[in-house]
C-alpha cells in the first residue's frame, strides 16, 4: 500500500482514502455540482447536467481507486486522470455560465474549488515522486 502523508497532521500516515483531505474536498465538490445542475433546464438532464455530474463523481472516485493501488506509479496515473477530470469539469462549468445556466458568482466559486483540488492533486503527485 502507498505510504501517503498528505493531511493536516503530517505525523499521521493515511490508512484509508476517506481520511485524505483531497478526497473529502472532492466529495464536497460532487455535492455542489449536483445542487448546481439541478437548476439546469430539463432538456439538459441527459446532456450537460449528466456529463458534469459524472465528471465530478470521477474526481474523488479516481483518488480513492488510485489510493488502493499497491504501487505509487499506479496511484499517480489515477491522480493524472483526476487532473484531467478537473479540467473537463472546469470547462463544463464555464460552458454552463456561457449558456446562462449559472451566474458569475456560482461559476467563480466552483472554479475556485476545482482549482484547489487540482493544486492538491499536483502536490500529491510530486510527493509520490
Residues of each region from the PLM?
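Amphipathic alpha-helical assembly/interaction segments
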Residues: 1-129
